[in-house]
């Protein structure tokens, strides 16, 4: 497992489970006119009227807009007072996990802490890219690790990459914030040396803390 796998375990939550989703939809007897014919007729009408082109253009614009500026993570406030706590990344496994040689090192049903098997050698920063004070705070940071990631909860990805001269990520649907219990930003996540916990810090943007 690499750090990428560790991030996946952090995202999945306390219980990693798999389920058979079964078959989607219901089966109906064929009726006249059949559904395919109705769909084709509708598409033809849309194309002839020009509505198809307008809908496709609107769809493309929406996809581009959401990829550059995804919807903000709801429920995230602004850090006003420093605070910190420990986070236990342990998960319950839904299946055996094997190493590169196929040997099982963690079995289904066991509670596993990823930090037992791979160190968390990176620092995660969560900020609101629409807050100039938080962007300025991010520019002052000196990560204690060789690898770090800037994760937006709000803001424009390309604008922040240009402003911070760094690759920037976005917490789509607030998955990481929910998993790590982050409800305010700026926030920083790092490993606790020699321990099996992560440290989550909430740091006011105006504070000089690094």
Curated annotation (Swiss-Prot):
Q: Where in the cell is it found?
A: Periplasm
Coiled coil located at which positions? Answer: none
Q: Which domain of life does the UniProt lineage start with? A: Bacteria
Entry GO CC: periplasmic space
Disulfide cross-links: none
**Quick one: signal sequence residues?**
1-18
| Record's keyword terms, sorted | Conjugation, Periplasm, Plasmid, Signal
Q: Check the record and name the Pfam families matching this protein.
A: TraW_N
Explain the consequences of disrupting this gene.
Answer: No F pili expressed on cell surface.
Q: What does this protein do?
A: Involved in F-pilus assembly. Required for F plasmid conjugative transfer.
The name under which this protein is listed is: Protein TraW
Source species of the chain: Escherichia coli (strain K12)
> What gene does the UniProt entry assign to this protein?
traW
């Amino acid at each position: 497992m690499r750090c990428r796998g560790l991030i996946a375990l952090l995202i999945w939550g306390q219980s990693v489970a798999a389920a058979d989703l079964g078959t989607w939809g219901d089966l109906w007897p064929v009726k006249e006119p059949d559904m395919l014919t109705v769909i084709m007729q509708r598409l033809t009408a849309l194309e002839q009227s020009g509505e198809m082109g307008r809908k496709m253009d609107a769809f493309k614009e929406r996809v581009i807009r959401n990829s550059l500026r995804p919807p903000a993570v709801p429920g995230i406030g602004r850090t006003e007072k420093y605070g910190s706590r420990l986070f236990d990344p342990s998960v319950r496994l839904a299946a055996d996990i094997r190493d590169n040689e196929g040997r099982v090192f963690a079995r289904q049903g066991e509670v596993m802490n990823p930090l037992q098997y791979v160190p968390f050698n990176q620092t995660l920063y969560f900020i609101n890219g629409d807050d100039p004070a938080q962007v300025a705070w991010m520019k002052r940071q000196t990560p204690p690790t060789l690898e770090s990631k800037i994760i937006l909860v709000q803001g424009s990805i390309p604008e922040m990459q240009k402003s911070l001269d760094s690759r920037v990520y976005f917490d789509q649907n607030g998955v990481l914030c929910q998993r790590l219990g982050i409800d305010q930003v700026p926030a920083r996540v790092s490993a606790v040396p020699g321990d099996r916990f992560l440290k989550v810090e909430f740091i006011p943007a105006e504070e000089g803390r690094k």
